[in-house]
Regions:
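Nucleotidyltransferase catalytic core that binds NTPs
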Residues: 1-160
């Protein structure tokens, strides 16, 4: 069985072949720590915007550099990647170690770049790269009340 979780170099090579065949490549990224229904709906919506959905996942060190919380991520990077790869709407998963996915987006050159509705379009990392080659940037509304931070707060409040 071929894995969907690939090193960057291998993924970029595969995507070059797909692009040559006219495949529309969609890219999104995130930490995806403690997956919830908001994540799955977001990823399903992203997939509907093209043929292949590539998900960039922050490594553990990258998540810690974002200063979400000192104890994040809860779930290790290899497990977060495997959970994402198990979803039917996700075609490929790739880890990235930088605080933002700018270099990865430049290498992948997606046709569609997708982020959650909590991102202002002009602040989306990689927007300039995608639009410069004729691609589009889209945002997807968040599921109200659903976030990993809210989920963690709820868990912590019930264990006190």
């Amino acid at each position: 069985m071929t894995t969907k979780v690939l090193p960057q170099a291998q993924l970029i090579s595969i995507l070059a072949g797909e692009r040559a065949r006219g495949t529309r490549i969609v890219f999104t990224n995130g930490c995806f720590d403690l997956m919830h229904i908001g994540h799955t709906r977001y990823l399903q919506a992203a997939k509907s915007m093209g043929d292949l959905l590539v998900v960039g996942v922050n490594t553990d060190a990258s998540v810690r550099s974002l200063e979400k919380a000192p104890d994040r991520p809860i779930v290790p990077e290899t497990q977060r990647a495997e959970v994402l790869a198990a979803l039917g709407c996700v075609d490929f998963v790739v880890l990235f170690a930088e605080p933002d996915p700018g270099r990865l987006i430049a290498a992948i050159q997606p046709d569609v770049l997708v982020k959650g509705g909590d991102w202002a379009p002009d602040t989306i990392v990689g927007r300039d790269v995608v639009e410069a080659r004729g691609g589009v940037v889209r945002t997807i509304p968040l599921v109200p009340g659903m976030s990993t931070t809210a989920l963690l707060q709820r868990i912590r409040s019930t264990t006190k």
